[in-house]
Design a protein with these regions (language model features):
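Conserved, single-site charged/polar hotspot
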Residues: 2-325
Length: 325
């Protein structure tokens, strides 16, 4: 099958849809009647989901509030400044010499997720887990902060609106200085990947999948293997480093231009997984993940001209794969 035919089939299987009204929708429209008519063209409008993100695990977590926060467990106290939580001897969250199953902090003031003010900071967040560049750094976040216990450690969880999460992801995964069009594309892809299991109720706790033969066992851990939150903050899900790197006008413009937009296929949000490097040829979904075929996740040869596609070897042949590598 030629590249043009594959491109045609892919384009026919994928569409874009806006799930909620853009924040600035209609501000430039003079006629309220026209604004109402335009809004009626937006299908399946919904409230922007709040996303929960697992940031870090440790026996002790130090944190800092840049602005006043309230705590559900201490309703009469305003929290501002430096604090810390510990793993107690009985396996709970220790704070102010008391033990809790969970602690919930929320900002008192309304937050602008594109500004650098009104944040909370976590100490020694590990990034690049199990990569050669793994290291610790302090990171700043907007939204709410919850502490719970997971895997015998205290876990810090950030609660944040979807668009604020995407605002950080496209700066953390790529670079905030990338071109506007690249940032727009990344925003739509990341938003689609994030929302597919949430909106289509596909969450399945402890989702550890495997493929087994007589001499081989392959296991992979899906994003919905997380029980206490939607996604984690590292490369297992999508790299999310708060407002630490999200500081350019192009990032803000990319989010506003694509707000609520996702990729759709046959009435469902696309599983828009992405990678940083394909080695020259991408793989079909079912060869990497679950044994499911998605027509929009086909093998793609990364070449300069369509004519070069025919010269790409069949990498399912071991000898060809070794020579290609």
């Amino acid at each position: 099958m030629g590249i043009e035919q594959r491109k045609k089939e892919w384009m026919e299987s994928v569409d874009a849809e806006r799930l909620w009204v853009p924040k600035e929708f209609g501000t430039e429209i003079d006629s309220s009647k026209k604004r109402k008519a335009d809004m009626e063209q937006l299908p399946k409008l919904m409230q922007e989901p709040i996303i929960t993100v697992g940031i870090m695990h440790a026996e002790r977590i130090g944190f800092f509030f840049d602005s006043p926060f309230r705590c559900a467990e201490f309703p009469n106290i305003t929290f501002d400044g430096e604090y810390e939580v510990f793993l107690s001897d009985d396996g709970r969250v220790s704070f102010f010499e008391q033990q809790f199953d969970s602690l919930h902090f929320t900002p008192i003031e309304e937050q602008d997720y594109t500004s650098e003010d009104g944040y909370f900071e976590l100490e020694d967040v590990v990034i690049g887990i199990n990569f050669h560049w793994e290291r610790k750094e302090n990171q700043r976040f907007k939204g709410g902060l919850t502490f719970m216990i997971e895997h015998g450690k205290v876990v810090a969880i950030n609660e944040i609106p979807t668009e604020a999460y995407i605002f950080s992801v496209i700066s953390s995964e790529m670079s905030a200085t990338a071109s506007l069009e690249l940032l727009k594309a990344h925003a739509v892809i990341s938003r689609s990947w994030l929302l597919k299991p949430i909106i289509h109720n596909e969450h399945n706790a402890n989702a550890v999948l495997e493929h087994r033969t007589d001499d081989e066992l392959i296991k992979w851990y899906e994003r919905d293997s997380h029980e206490l939150y939607n996604v984690c903050a590292d490369d297992h899900c999508q790299r999310y480093q708060g407002i630490t790197r999200a500081r350019t006008e192009n990032v803000r413009l990319a989010i506003e231009a694509t707000r609520g937009l996702v990729l759709m296929s046959h009435g469902e949000i696309c599983d828009a997984r992405f990678s940083k490097s394909c080695g020259g040829v991408s793989e079909v979904f079912e060869s990497c993940w679950a044994d499911v075929h998605y027509p929009y996740l086909e093998r793609v040869v990364d070449v300069k001209t369509p004519e070069s596609v025919a010269s790409a070897p069949d990498l399912t042949v071991e000898a060809n794969a070794e020579a290609w590598i």
